[in-house]
């Protein structure tokens, strides 16, 4: 299935996909969050008949439209890369992966594409009720798009509802609902959408604070701040619940990722959660005797509780996961990395032997090889791993990204609470420090979201599909120079699109809500 491939090709293919995904995620969360906020504002207008709320909704709707258009462009490129750069992946799991993507394209995207036209051009042309319904259906469509994409991503983290067909050398879906309703998929959807809501709330809050700093459109700004702060606080509180669920699912399904998130090399019972820490750069191998941290502050036993819902539960570290021998939460003894690698090689060899036996029409031998393949298939991907150290993701990047996400999440809760208190006291319009904090918090939501995706994707390495297909076995056999060329072309293109969006948005913001109403 995989030949000798230049490692530079793997690195450049990963870099290109990461570039596209991270640029795409600059636009998606604002679509998810701002879309709901504008729909809430239009709902207030529908219920009250207050024209000020209509102008407010129209202004944020204009910024939503600018962002939506750029997000669609980057998303299309991202989907095409599966076929161009990751053809082995596309072949091996295309039967499963393409199903949610197809539903996203046929149902969700066309739904939002249909109603967005009414939302933008239907003011005073259709009834208030129909226009409001179109606005809500547009954001529901966008959210459903996110749902199916996240189901596909969750399946890569936790592959279920499929079986391997040795005759086609492909994984084939046999239970659609197991894929769509897996606990990882459900939790990932809510966690990701809530993060988008927070980005939208911070965006509205920050732009509104800019108007207050400029002493412009004060009533518009104050009403927008109130809606965004309430919305953002609700999302920030709910995301704690989904974050806890994410940590639990990672502990159950991807223990190596959890160990990297915590810089945990030696596991144990009653393990503490690192609140703040500085990793020891001298620790370059899981085999050395260097301490993992130069400095750290831990919450006693909290990691054990997050991972197993038991303050004294055992949580394996990186060394334990590599060496095996510990008792898992299912009561079984964990295999070592070397044992898994041997089982993976056995599965790969059994597949080759099975296909040869089928070709030779040796039914008896084919049956034996198939049994061997099925017994060892859960470790199929390990057969492509050459060194157990390859199973360890980048600890530093995963560890620090996780803390950036969590610390910023706590900051957002504090910001929204303070904003609502100041709003209740009628102080926001005259509190310039809070206005500056609100304005400069806009990029922090994006940083938190990007950090979360780094934890999810870097922490999963070396796997494209957990335990089944490593990233190194997923790529297309291309000339590395061609991938480098398209990497830089995409970098230039995406940067131009980003600059264009920011420029158009800044121009619209400077014109103000009065211009958006015409």
Question: What is the meaning of each model-derived region?
Answer:
Residues 1-22, 49-56, 80-102, 154-190, ...:
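Membrane-interface interhelical loops and short amphipathic "cap" helices
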Residues 28-36, 107-115, 196-206, 404-420, ...:
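Hydrophobic alpha-helical transmembrane segments
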Residues 48-66, 92-98, 102, 122-140, ...:
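Membrane-interfacial loop-to-helix junctions in multi-pass inner-membrane proteins
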Residues 67-137, 154, 458-462:
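Membrane-interface helix-loop-helix modules in multi-pass inner-membrane proteins
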Residues 117-125, 130-136, 147-156, 173-176, ...:
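Internal alpha-helical transmembrane segments
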Residues 152, 234-338, 342:
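Aromatic-rich transmembrane-lumenal/periplasmic boundary elements in polytopic membrane proteins
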Residues 390-453, 484-508:
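C-terminal substrate/ligand-recognition segments
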């Amino acid at each position: 299935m995989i030949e000798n491939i230049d490692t530079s090709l793997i690195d450049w293919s990963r870099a290109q996909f990461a570039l596209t995904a991270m640029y795409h995620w600059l636009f998606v969360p604002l679509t998810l969050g701002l879309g709901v906020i504008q729909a809430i504002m239009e709902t207030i207008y529908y219920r009250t008949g207050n024209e000020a709320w209509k102008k407010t909704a129209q202004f944020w709707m204009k910024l939503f439209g600018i962002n939506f258009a750029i997000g669609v462009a980057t998303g299309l490129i991202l989907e095409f890369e599966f076929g161009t750069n990751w053809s082995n992946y596309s072949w091996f799991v295309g039967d499963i992966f393409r199903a949610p993507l197809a539903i996203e394209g046929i149902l969700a995207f066309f739904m939002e594409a249909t109603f967005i036209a009414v939302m933008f051009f239907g003011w005073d042309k259709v009834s208030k009720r129909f226009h409001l319904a179109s606005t809500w259906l547009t954001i529901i469509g966008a959210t459903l798009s996110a749902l199916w994409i996240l189901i596909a991503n969750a399946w890569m983290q936790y592959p279920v509802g499929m079986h391997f067909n040795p005759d086609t050398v492909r994984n084939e879906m046999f239970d659609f609902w197991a894929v769509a309703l897996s606990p990882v998929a459900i939790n990932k959807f809510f966690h990701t959408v809530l993060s988008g809501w927070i980005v939208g709330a911070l965006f509205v809050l920050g732009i509104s604070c800019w108007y207050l700093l400029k002493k412009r459109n004060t009533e518009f700004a104050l009403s927008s701040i109130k809606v965004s702060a309430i919305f953002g606080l609700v999302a920030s509180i709910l995301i704690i619940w989904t974050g806890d669920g994410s940590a639990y699912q990672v502990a159950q399904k991807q223990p190596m990722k959890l160990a990297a998130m915590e810089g945990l090399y030696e596991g144990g019972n009653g393990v503490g959660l690192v609140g703040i820490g500085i990793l020891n750069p001298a620790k370059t191998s899981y085999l050395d005797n260097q301490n993992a941290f130069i400095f750290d502050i831990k919450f006693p036993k909290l990691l054990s509780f997050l991972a197993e819902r038991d303050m004294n539960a055992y949580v394996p570290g990186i060394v334990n996961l590599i060496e095996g021998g510990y008792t898992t939460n299912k009561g079984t003894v964990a295999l070592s990395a070397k044992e898994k690698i041997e089982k993976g090689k056995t599965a790969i060899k059994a597949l080759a032997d099975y296909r040869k036996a089928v070709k030779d029409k040796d039914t008896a031998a084919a049956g034996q090889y198939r049994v061997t393949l099925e017994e060892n298939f859960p470790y199929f991907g390990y057969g492509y791993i050459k060194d157990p150290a390859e199973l360890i993701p980048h600890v530093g990047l995963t560890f620090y990204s996780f803390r950036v996400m969590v610390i910023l999440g706590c900051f957002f809760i504090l910001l929204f609470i303070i904003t609502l208190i100041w709003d209740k006291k009628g102080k926001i319009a005259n509190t310039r420090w809070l206005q500056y904090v609100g304005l400069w918090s806009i990029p922090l939501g994006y940083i938190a979201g990007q950090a979360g995706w780094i934890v999810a994707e870097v922490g999963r390495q070396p796997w494209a599909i957990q335990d089944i297909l490593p990233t190194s076995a997923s790529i297309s056999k291309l000339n590395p120079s061609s991938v480098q060329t398209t990497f830089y072309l995409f970098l230039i293109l995406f940067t131009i699109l980003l600059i264009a969006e920011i420029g158009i948005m800044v121009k619209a913001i400077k014109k103000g809500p009065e211009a958006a109403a015409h």
